[in-house]
Each structure stands twice: as structure tokens, then as C-alpha cells.
């Protein structure tokens, strides 16, 4: 891949509205040719999706997914701008794929890292700062190590940061962005709930010998 200058990245960003990293990748893939880079971004659905990201997405649909065996279920709200798009195959396919993603990711609790409450972040920092492997390290180094670990942990909790189950070379955020570009509307995952059969129910454990004895005495 060719080296990419900051000036070219800025020019492409101004022209397309795409993110800095997306512009850098597009230019690297096209040997610094801005015209081809624009086409590359459009093919990936990135250029148009970025410009639409600030528009209101008040329509959409709530999808459900029940995993094989009916032990895991998901409800997920996916928003777009028009009811017409919400009924389309591309949108419905995305709704189904993201719902399946939630079912496959038991550790995911939030749509994005921006949704994670500060008290959860503070708790994770406290846990990491107290780990034995940091003993004896300078404070500045501790902070740097913890920041790296926290960043990784927060991404594990974020749906949009997960590798897409059908194509691990892209994230769920990339998938949503790509479909939004193809649809031509702003598309956002608003919220979801994941259900696991029996979750939170305490099962009384009975010793087998005690159970037999109680049956004998009755």
C-alpha cells in the first residue's frame, strides 16, 4: 500500500464526509488516487453514510431472533428515516443479522462505548488498577496499561465494536454503515435486550444421599 499524506486524507474527508481512518484506508487501497478513493468509499457504503449520520432516524422496526433450541432470544430496535426503507429487504436483513449478533455475544451490554455509564467505567478502572501485575510499576506506566485494558474491556461490552459474525474482517459498526450507504438513509441501532433461558433463577441443589434419605423417612 502507498504512503498517504495528511493533506490527501483531509481533502478526501472534506469531499466525502467519511471518517479520517476510512479516508486513509481508501487512499492506501487506491495508491493515493482521490477519484478512485471516492469510488472505493462509495462501494463500501461509507461516503454517503457518513453525510447522512446527522439526520433524524425516527422510523424503523423492532426485530426478534430466537436461537436454535429456544434458549436465547433477542429483541432489537433498528432505526432509519422512512417507513418505506424499514420494510425493504436490505433493512430487514440488517435487522436480522444484528439481532443474531446480539444472540451470539453474551458479554455485550451496550450499543456503543458511548452508552456505557461512567460508574461502570470507574468500576472497571478500579479493578484494573488493583491487579497484582501492576505492583511496583511507576504510576504513569500503570495509567497507560490500565487505559489500554479499559479500552479493550469497553469494546467487549459494545455491540458496534464486535467483529461481525458473518465476516470477521468488519465490525458491526462497519456493517451498519455499509447498509446505510446502500439504502441512502441514516441507520442506527437504538437498543436491544438479550434473554437467556433460566437466567437469574436460583436452582436448589440437593445432595443425592440426603434426598434418598428423606424419601425413605417419608
UniProtKB/Swiss-Prot annotation:
Belongs to the EF-Ts family. Pfam families: EF_TS. GO terms for molecular function: translation elongation factor activity. Its main location: cytoplasm. It is found in: Cytoplasm. Transmembrane segments: none annotated. GO terms for cellular component: cytoplasm. Keywords: Cytoplasm, Elongation factor, Protein biosynthesis. InterPro entries: EF-Ts_dimer_sf, Transl_elong_EFTs/EF1B, Transl_elong_EFTs/EF1B_dimer, Transl_elong_Ts_CS, UBA-like_sf. This is Elongation factor Ts. Residues 82-85 are annotated as: Involved in Mg(2+) ion dislocation from EF-Tu. The keyword Methyltransferase does not apply. Coiled coil: none annotated. PROSITE patterns: EF_TS_1 (PS01126), EF_TS_2 (PS01127). Associates with the EF-Tu.GDP complex and induces the exchange of GDP to GTP. It remains bound to the aminoacyl-tRNA.EF-Tu.GTP complex up to the GTP hydrolysis stage on the ribosome.
Amino acid at each position: 500500500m502507498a504512503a498517504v499524506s495528511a493533506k490527501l486524507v483531509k481533502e478526501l474527508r472534506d469531499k466525502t464526509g467519511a471518517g479520517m481512518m476510512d479516508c486513509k484506508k481508501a487512499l492506501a487501497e487506491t495508491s493515493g488516487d482521490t477519484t478512485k478513493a471516492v469510488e472505493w468509499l462509495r462501494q463500501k457504503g461509507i461516503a454517503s453514510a457518513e453525510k447522512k449520520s446527522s439526520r433524524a432516524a425516527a422510523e424503523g422496526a423492532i426485530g426478534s431472533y430466537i436461537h436454535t433450541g429456544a434458549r436465547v432470544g433477542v429483541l432489537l430496535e433498528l432505526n432509519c428515516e422512512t417507513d418505506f426503507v424499514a420494510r425493504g429487504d436490505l433493512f430487514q436483513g440488517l435487522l436480522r443479522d444484528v439481532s443474531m449478533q446480539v444472540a451470539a455475544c453474551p458479554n455485550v451490554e451496550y450499543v456503543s462505548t458511548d452508552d456505557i455509564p461512567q460508574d461502570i467505567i470507574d468500576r472497571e478502572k478500579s479493578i484494573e488498577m488493583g491487579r497484582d501485575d501492576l505492583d511496583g510499576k511507576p504510576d504513569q506506566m500503570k495509567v497507560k496499561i490500565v487505559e489500554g485494558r479499559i479500552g479493550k474491556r469497553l469494546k467487549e461490552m459494545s455491540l458496534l465494536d464486535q467483529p461481525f459474525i458473518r465476516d470477521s474482517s468488519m465490525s458491526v459498526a462497519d456493517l451498519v454503515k455499509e447498509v446505510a450507504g446502500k439504502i441512502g438513509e441514516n441507520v442506527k441501532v437504538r437498543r436491544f435486550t438479550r434473554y437467556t433461558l433460566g437466567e437469574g433463577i436460583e436452582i436448589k441443589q440437593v445432595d443425592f444421599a440426603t434426598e434418598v434419605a428423606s424419601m425413605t423417612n417419608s
